[in-house]
């Protein structure tokens, strides 16, 4: 139903995090009466944004058992709320419409939209596409899981402005509007298995993006993911990767599109398969479809700054290099981070376990990682799975891990924070964790 048809009606928002608050504000602006439910209401009630929403009529409660779903015309669920939440199950039983904040924003949008998903690299590719488009006169804004909810911006975007949406699997679970002009699936590796239980379920969520394309839309998929999950790709798509059979590919010297050479890679990009190069291919596939010429892409690439906490060099002290990869929150991200550092590595890992095995690290760590410092809730599991093959030391906190790693490392080594886990056992989020790591390193 178009958003204007909800004027004067009632909406229930489940979860009042960043996207839930944005959805509440958006609905209030659209003339909708809003009830929000959040189990952490007592911690939220005095926050400025919540107070502002309440002043405009938002009603909030923590208890979901007393809610009568029959009185609501629309139910909006926040990304972190699992599909087995009692209210969601009850809503489906009552045949009530349940959507996410992204779907809500798209219903009010007449803009051109690009979608970006995958396990690792989503934020970087979203920001890179946005940067390339803006640098070449195509006004664009990065929204969604990158940090700014779509509903917070959609009513103020210029008519010609392009929305570049970073989409998590959680957001895709409640997104079905066919509004995307282009979309890309970057890679699919183990993550969020505490929610999805199997890789098959996780991959299905990622490939939901293909169902959100316009009829004229174009989907690009990283080749390995396309091969492994071919049975889930029951819609048209093109691949990118390292083989000439891909729509967009590289031979590690140049980039090709449909077999035609586009440009020679800058020297620092040549010679080695890596995560950054795959991100570049994904961004170029999208940008080329938007009319960006090869040299325009290369010129804009020179001024792109990679977002923080992604194998970010912090400083060098006594010949030891320190790197912050706090955004490395899954198994594959840690392996990519370790492979990107051309020094012996002392690795700080751990946090909230996400259901995958750490054994996969061993093939990459052999001869490269000298020692692992395990922290947080996952520390014992990391030690149990790795300690027969590599030195693992459990530390009480990040502070102790940083100090011990610095003490053990010597000139020419690297200390890398790449947790492979979520952050919320000890930190507010991965940004808080990364900033704390930097602070501790600077105190050494």
From Swiss-Prot:
Domain of life: Bacteria
SUPFAM superfamilies tied to this protein: MurCD N-terminal domain, MurD-like peptide ligases, catalytic domain, MurD-like peptide ligases, peptide-binding domain
Keywords: ATP-binding, Cell cycle, Cell division, Cell shape, Cell wall biogenesis/degradation, Cytoplasm, Ligase, Nucleotide-binding, Peptidoglycan synthesis
Localization per Swiss-Prot or TrEMBL: Cytoplasm
Entry binding sites for ATP: 118-124
Annotated pathway: Cell wall biogenesis; peptidoglycan biosynthesis
GO CC terms, sorted: cytoplasm
One GO MF term attached to the UniProt entry: ATP binding
EC category: ligase
Gene Ontology terms: biological process: cell division; cell wall organization; peptidoglycan biosynthetic process; regulation of cell shape
Catalytic activity entry: UDP-N-acetyl-alpha-D-muramoyl-L-alanine + D-glutamate + ATP = UDP-N-acetyl-alpha-D-muramoyl-L-alanyl-D-glutamate + ADP + phosphate + H(+)
Enzyme Commission designation: 6.3.2.9
Main location: cytoplasm
Similarity comment text for this entry: Belongs to the MurCDEF family.
HAMAP family: MurD
Protein function: Cell wall formation. Catalyzes the addition of glutamate to the nucleotide precursor UDP-N-acetylmuramoyl-L-alanine (UMA).
Protein name per the record: UDP-N-acetylmuramoylalanine--D-glutamate ligase
Chain's gene name: murD
């Amino acid at each position: 139903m178009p958003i204007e048809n909800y004027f004067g009606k009632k909406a229930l928002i489940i979860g009042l995090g960043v996207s839930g608050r944005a959805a509440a504000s958006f609905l209030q602006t659209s003339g909708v009466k809003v009830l929000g439910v959040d189990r952490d209401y007592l911690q939220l009630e005095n926050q400025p944004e919540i107070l502002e929403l309440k002043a405009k009529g938002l009603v909030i409660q923590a208890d979901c058992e007393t809610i009568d779903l029959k009185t609501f015309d629309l139910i909006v669920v926040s990304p972190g709320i699992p599909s087995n939440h009692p209210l969601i199950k009850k809503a489906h039983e009552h045949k009530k419409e349940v959507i996410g904040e992204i779907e809500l924003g798209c219903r009010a949008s007449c803009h051109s939209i690009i979608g970006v998903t995958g396990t690792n690299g989503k934020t970087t590719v979203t920001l890179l596409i946005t940067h390339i488009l803006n640098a070449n006169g195509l006004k664009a804004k990065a929204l969604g899981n990158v940090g700014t909810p779509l509903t917070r911006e959609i009513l103020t975007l210029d008519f010609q402005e392009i929305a570049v949406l970073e989409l998590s699997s959680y957001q895709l679970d409640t997104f079905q509007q066919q509004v995307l002009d282009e979309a890309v699936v970057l890679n699919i590796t183990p993550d969020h298995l505490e929610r999805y239980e199997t890789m098959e379920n996780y991959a299905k969520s990622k490939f939901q993006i293909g169902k959100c394309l316009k009829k004229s839309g174009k989907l690009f998929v990283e080749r390995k993911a396309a091969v492994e999950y071919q049975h889930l790709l029951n819609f048209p798509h093109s691949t990118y990767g390292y083989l000439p059979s891909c729509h967009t590919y590289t031979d590690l010297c140049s980039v090709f599109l449909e077999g035609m050479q586009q440009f020679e890679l800058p020297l620092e990009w040549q010679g080695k398969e890596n995560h950054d190069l795959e991100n570049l291919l994904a961004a170029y596939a999208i940008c080329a479809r938007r009319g960006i010429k090869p040299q325009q892409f290369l010129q804009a690439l020179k001024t792109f700054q990679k977002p923080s906490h992604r194998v970010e060099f912090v400083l060098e002290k006594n010949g030891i290099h320190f790197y912050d990869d706090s955004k490395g929150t899954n198994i594959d991200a840690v392996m990519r981070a370790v492979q990107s550092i051309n020094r012996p590595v002392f690795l700080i890992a751990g946090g909230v376990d996400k259901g995958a095995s750490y054994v996969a690290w061993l093939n990459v760590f052999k001869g490269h990682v000298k020692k692992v410092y395990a922290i947080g809730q996952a520390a014992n599991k990391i030690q149990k799975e790795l300690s027969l093959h590599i030195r693992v030391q459990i530390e009480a906190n990040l502070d102790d891990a940083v100090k011990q790693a610095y003490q053990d490392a010597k000139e020419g080594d690297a200390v890398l924070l790449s947790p492979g886990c979520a952050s919320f056992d000890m930190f507010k989020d991965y940004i808080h964790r990364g900033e704390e790591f930097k602070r501790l390193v600077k105190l050494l």
